[in-house]
Amino acid sequence: MECYYIVISSTHLSNGHFRNIKGVFRGPLSKNGNKTLDYAEKENTIAKALEDLKANFYCELCDKQYYKHQEFDNHINSYDHAHKQRLKELKQREFARNVASKSRKDERKQEKALQRLHKLAELRKETVCAPGSGPMFKSTTVTVRENCNEISQRVVVDSVNNQQDFKYTLIHSEENTKDATTVAEDPESANNYTAKNNQVGDQAQGIHRHKIGFSFAFPKKASVKLESSAAAFSEYSDDASVGKGFSRKSRFVPSACHLQQSSPTDVLLSSEEKTNSFHPPEAMCRDKETVQTQEIKEVSSEKDALLLPSFCKFQLQLSSDADNCQNSVPLADQIPLESVVINEDIPVSGNSFELLGNKSTVLDMSNDCISVQATTEENVKHNEASTTEVENKNGPETLAPSNTEEVNITIHKKTNFCKRQCEPFVPVLNKHRSTVLQWPSEMLVYTTTKPSISYSCNPLCFDFKSTKVNNNLDKNKPDLKDLCSQQKQEDICMGPLSDYKDVSTEGLTDYEIGSSKNKCSQVTPLLADDILSSSCDSGKNENTGQRYKNISCKIRETEKYNFTKSQIKQDTLDEKYNKIRLKETHEYWFHKSRRKKKRKKLCQHHHMEKTKESETRCKMEAENSYTENAGKYLLEPISEKQYLAAEQLLDSHQLLDKRPKSESISLSDNEEMCKTWNTEYNTYDTISSKNHCKKNTILLNGQSNATMIHSGKHNLTYSRTYCCWKTKMSSCSQDHRSLVLQNDMKHMSQNQAVKRGYNSVMNESERFYRKRRQHSHSYSSDESLNRQNHLPEEFLRPPSTSVAPCKPKKKRRRKRGRFHPGFETLELKENTDYPVKDNSSLNPLDRLISEDKKEKMKPQEVAKIERNSEQTNQLRNKLSFHPNNLLPSETNGETEHLEMETTSGELSDVSNDPTTSVCVASAPTKEAIDNTLLEHKERSENINLNEKQIPFQVPNIERNFRQSQPKSYLCHYELAEALPQGKMNETPTEWLRYNSGILNTQPPLPFKEAHVSGHTFVTAEQILAPLALPEQALLIPLENHDKFKNVPCEVYQHILQPNMLANKVKFTFPPAALPPPSTPLQPLPLQQSLCSTSVTTIHHTVLQQHAAAAAAAAAAAAAGTFKVLQPHQQFLSQIPALTRTSLPQLSVGPVGPRLCPGNQPTFVAPPQMPIIPASVLHPSHLAFPSLPHALFPSLLSPHPTVIPLQPLF
């Protein structure tokens, strides 16, 4: 190779040639070593080299030819060449990416296409569609081990088919769940029926666990729970060797469903009634003997039908006609909802899901809720209706006890039962009678033939929409008929599950009778369901209670529906005794309502002036007259109170006995009391008082008079409380009513107290007398008590109090609102001490026991009631002895009456309740009485009837508190004494109630109320008379000072100035009289400036809301507005803003902040502000239901104008 030396020198020529090569080796000169090369050879070499250069120095990328190595290298290293190279690479990469993406897309498309093809292939492979998988239905299949955990509790033997022995395992698993999804998952909970031939059945009876397909079909446009429409059908793996095992559609709607066949021990529990049944029935049908697949399928179809219509809860006797209806297994108990439409007649056409759909999903809910008892009752009714022939004569009778008893009733399929079912699916046997299909009910054609059902069209090709519309139209008519028949029934619960839907369930006539009390059969079923859920297997009483509870819930759901008494009367045959009681109760109610109407008329005459105060009241009165009549004869609990009405219905039946007594007592007393409180009592029973209840009825929007009647009849404290409250509310101004109504649903009792407060303010003087009567009567019954609280307060208000009727209403409303929780509880307890157990009276069973109120009542309470009535006069005399009587007659004598009544009531309570009697004895201290007298005088002078009303209201408030007030409360002598031991333990709300009156030191007008209740209510006078509050007491600000804005200046003038109150009003707290407070509250000096400003507001609030004082106190405590006063310290001058922590925490919920807004100055204790001993508050938290803000429009909201406080004394 030639070696070139690059020599840069002058020897280089411009053309690159060397001039002279000197000393430079340029390679071999010649081959032969000759320094001189041939020219020709040399030229050849050069040419060749040039060609090589051209070939070697050509840039393809740039398409450039270089002849010299150096130039070529320079080009390759140039930016131009590099840039082109990058561009080329980028293009290449982009191209590669594009190609790859396209390839991937293509691959994906191919995969999708393959998937589609596979899907199509799979779909094509699926030759069989699950029944009900048509356009309306979507189905899924779940496999469940059939015999898993098979427990055969009851055996249903088909007497007709002796060959076949069905062993149904009923697994009663307590489930409130209404979802049947778990049923499919849980073979135990699911009703699994394994039908096996004799050959294989006995051997593999507990061994083989065949998979059963559960088809859960839901109408696409129906809001249905899984269990309601789920249809469980069995897939038979071995037709020859093994009887086709099928599982009844398993739903967790366990109900007391009994497969009624020839053997009385055979009972099939259907899980239809999830909520009601404590256990989902798992029934396994095995064919111990050679069992025809058809029969097994019939049973399964029946079971399925039962399961499917669990929503409907219709106890239809399913005649699964494996043997041409010979083996009709009435699963009515099991399947209250539906009957299996097997080629036999389908007795449960009324159970059809469509019917449910027409009624509402509520129906479904109620059906699920229906308990075994309800289903049993329905079955009994069904039998009674003779719509189904019962092969077992004892079947219908045993059905009622079927909850506990295993009743086998074989019902012959009947044509009348062969009505179109309303269920979305009907278990039917295929033409070969080998498979039980869940066939869409729309597609079923009922015939008079033995199979009675024909289905041929492919569900996928079936036009469900058109048929469903027609069916709904047809079904609605039967529903009306059923409703009519149901309405004839006494108990709402009688047919909780019965045919609410259509007459087509004549086979379900029993159910119709039971469940279709009202057109809202849904509501009835709901009631029944709830009841059933409460006691699926419990006795009839339990069922009744549950039904009432359920009725309340159902009533809520079916507010749009009105219950008539006949509807309510409808009760399941299972609850025949209840029905009888209900009938008696209803009869009693009718008589009672008549008497009440008369009394109401009298009271209305008395109250017309007051009721005329507001047009709304008059309107309410007019409506109430209608509502009252309707309510008396028709249970029309509308909306909010319907749930209460349900409970009240239970209570009404239970408490009717005790209530009639109280009514009679109240009648006699009413005559004495101008029948005012009695009217109110009766009205309260029916719907508070007509004047108020009518308004209240309207206001309550379906807290119908019937519901009120129910509550009253039931002697339900709550219902009464609601009624009274509604009455008060109606009597109150519409604004207050609206507030109360807003709170009505949430705090029926609280609002009730408020309403009472208003009414009492309106009619305080009248109520004074009535209330005295009422006190004696209230001992008889909660009703009387509540009514006393109700009207007497209105009456208690002196005629002069009518000057500020609205304010008193507000006051009472506030007081009641405050004390309402306590009042509710108190009323329950005070309900002639049934209340104490009438707290339990909330329980329907307790309500039933309410007849035995006195028995339930502690002996002290019973004595207390009697004593209250007797001691009312005695205590009046005592009051004359007590300084309370010193209250000048300036109070229009009503105050004296109130004092007398209050004292008597208090003393009665004291005597009744020895634990509190000590406090009561010490309660009427001379100083307190003097203060009370002064206060009373000033009230009379100022005609501060509102204040008087407040004291009157205070007893009601005290009553309210008594329910929640614990024994240990230092509170009211009457309260403590009157409260039974149980009552004494109640929350300090009672204290608040009592103390509100004490703190205000208003004339003890509330004595009337206290006397009226005669139970645990301490009259303001007695409270004030001793004024012996514990050394640590809480001042409770009244709730609605806004209401006081409307109060005339007169009222404010009556409010003590801080100095006057502090100087002249000193409470002596006798230590012996009152138990020492659990936690001493430090006295906080109250700024007089604050006193002047907030005292006005608070004072009016207190005056207007003694009844609501408890609720307000709780709210205030929650808001931290309570103030602690040393008993000996001047109230207003020394009351500082109480630290919120110092006061016991009252769970007032959102009300507290509204009552006591932060911007408000610390409330000053007005003369009438209740004083709550710390011991009372601390021992137990005051549990106030969350009071609606409307009820308490910010207790301490700053007053736009502060009326100068004038010395009260």
Curated annotation (Swiss-Prot):
GO terms for biological process: positive regulation of dendritic spine maintenance; positive regulation of gene expression; positive regulation of neuron projection development; regulation of neuron projection development. InterPro entries: ZnF-G_patch_domain (IPR052445), Znf_C2H2_sf (IPR036236), Znf_C2H2_type (IPR013087). Residues 380-401, 792-860 are annotated as: Disordered. Disulfide bonds: none annotated. Residues 807-819 have a biased composition (Basic residues). Keywords: Metal-binding, Zinc, Zinc-finger. One of its GO terms (molecular function) is zinc ion binding. A zinc finger (C2H2-type) spans 57-81. GO terms for cellular component: cytoplasm; dendritic microtubule; dendritic shaft; dendritic spine; growth cone; neuronal cell body; nucleus; plasma membrane. Residues 380-394, 826-836, 848-860 have a biased composition (Basic and acidic residues). This is Zinc finger protein 804A. The gene is ZNF804A.
